[in-house]
Swiss-Prot record:
UniProt organism field: Bacillus cereus (strain ATCC 14579 / DSM 31 / CCUG 7414 / JCM 2152 / NBRC 15305 / NCIMB 9373 / NCTC 2599 / NRRL B-3711)
GO molecular function, one term: UDP-N-acetylglucosamine 1-carboxyvinyltransferase activity
Gene name for this UniProt entry: murA1
Name this protein carries in UniProt: UDP-N-acetylglucosamine 1-carboxyvinyltransferase 1
Active-site residue list: 117
Binding residues for phosphoenolpyruvate: 22-23
């Protein structure tokens, strides 16, 4: 079993560079299927297990995909298959993002119902609502969702009941080849939506208003391969901001975009963290004492749900009572029990978590319950007494590139080991970076 073993007590200092955004690259790779002429070349692509998975989905759909040196080249000019099977989709719910492009290109798509992190139900009903509004017929059964259209998709006015990021992306992609104009209202506003729109426009689409609540997509007859650079990962940047703050360290986070981090920055400054915008990125200096705050996750530009668990780790070190309320996903508090194993004073009340601090955390063996929880448990381990062993690293690998190595370079006492091979002695870990 692979584990990350971390010993607490080190202030982290230095420089770290964030990768291209996981939440941007996956829908962009899926949208590359829309190009029936030429090759798409994507740069700043992070080397993540989810990227390998979506690439395999595209290959199964008959696209040619080459991934090397943080660059993905995609040729989808051949006739595409219409089915994304369970063996791929079960690993990652973002696989459902191929549905819109397939429906637009082929008039038909058959996708296994998605997997990914076990965070509530996370239904795809808003995706399907959009496809139906554009003239598609949708059937769900036997573990698959199938959509087909006679002729071609037609532009429509679509109102999302919730500003779902995935639904906004999928509908926006499908609408690029629809006949007429699609107006998508109550659309998600995340930076990753803007990045996808920029990529679609580079291919020849006509998308306007991305980043606002109303997006207009004027359909075109054909899309072409293009070059595109993926935006930096704001969630990885936020995670390293917490690493600096929680250890009282001083970290320059290169390649971070300050405009994408406003809600995170606001809450951390409220806690007493010093944040300086520099030409290279964002510098974060942790205080001697953290102040308690309340946080409510919201769609962008509100506080991102993907930073909830990391901030929970930070608030466990704050002086006073803090509360985090989760409004985006249900059942995203599974990591609370793992924090309790580390001696945290923390409890769940409905859709909120109450924390009393500061906590003297104790190292323990804990299991990552999802991607961001994996990072949060490691962050908590940075300030725990003794050794923290984090298992279920498959979650971590879905969203972070060499996370333990980046932390080690900043001064953390941390190692990733495979205990199938041999039991790792605590002394061996304590000797790291001595």
């Amino acid at each position: 079993m692979e584990k990350i073993i971390v010993r607490g007590g080190k202030r982290l200092n230095g420089t770290v560079r964030v990768e291209g955004a996981k939440n941007a690259v996956l829908p962009i790779i899926a949208a590359a299927l829309l190009a029936s002429d030429g090759k798409n070349v994507l740069s700043e692509v992070p080397v993540l297990s989810d990227v390998y998975t979506i690439n395999e989905v595209l290959r199964h759909l008959n696209a040619e995909v080459v991934f090397e040196n943080n660059q993905v080249t995609i040729d989808s000019s051949k006739e595409l298959n219409i089915e994304a099977p369970f063996e791929y989709v079960r690993k990652m719910r973002a696989s459902v993002q191929v549905m819109g492009p397939l429906l637009a290109r082929n008039g038909r798509a058959r996708i296994a119902l998605p997997g990914g992190c076990a965070i509530g139900s996370r239904p795809i009903d808003q995706h399907l609502k959009g496809f139906e509004a554009m003239g598609a017929k949708v059937q769900v059964g036997n573990g698959f969702v199938e959509a087909y259209v006679e002729g071609e998709l037609k532009g429509a006015k679509i109102y999302l009941d919730f500003p779902s990021v995935g639904a906004t992306e999928n509908i926006m992609s499908a609408a690029t080849l629809a006949k007429g104009t699609t107006i998508l209202e109550n659309a998600a506003k995340e930076p990753e939506i803007v990045d996808l729109a920029n990529f679609l426009n580079a291919m020849g689409a006509k998308v306007r208003g991305a980043g606002t609540g109303t997006i207009r997509i004027e359909g075109v007859d054909k899309l072409y391969g293009a070059n595109h650079s993926i935006i930096p990962d704001r969630i990885e940047a936020g995670t390293f901001m917490v690493a600096a703050a929680i250890t009282g360290g001083d970290i320059l986070i290169e390649n971070a975009v300050p405009e994408h981090l406003r809600s995170i920055t606001a809450k951390m400054e409220e806690m007493g963290v010093k944040i300086i915008e520099e030409n290279e990125g964002v510098r974060v200096i942790g205080p001697d004492k953290l102040k308690a705050v309340d946080i409510k996750t919201m769609p962008h530009p509100g506080f991102p749900t993907d930073m909830q668990s990391q901030m929970m780790a930070l608030l466990l070190q704050a002086d006073g009572t803090s509360m985090i309320t989760e409004t985006v996903f249900e059942n995203r508090f599974m990591h609370v029990e793992e924090f309790r194993r580390m001696n945290a004073d923390i409890k769940i009340e409905g859709r909120s978590v109450i924390m009393n601090g500061p906590n003297s955390l104790q190292g323990a063996e804990v299991a990552a319950t999802d991607l961001r929880a994996a990072a949060a448990l490691i962050l908590a381990g940075l300030v725990s007494e003794g050794y923290t062993r984090v298992t279920e690293l498959k979650h971590l690998d879905r969203g972070y590139v060499n996370f333990h190595k980046k932390l080690a370079a900043l001064g953390a006492t941390i190692e990733r080991v495979n205990e199938k091979v041999e039991e790792v002695k605590e002394q061996e870990v304590s000797d790291l970076h001595a």
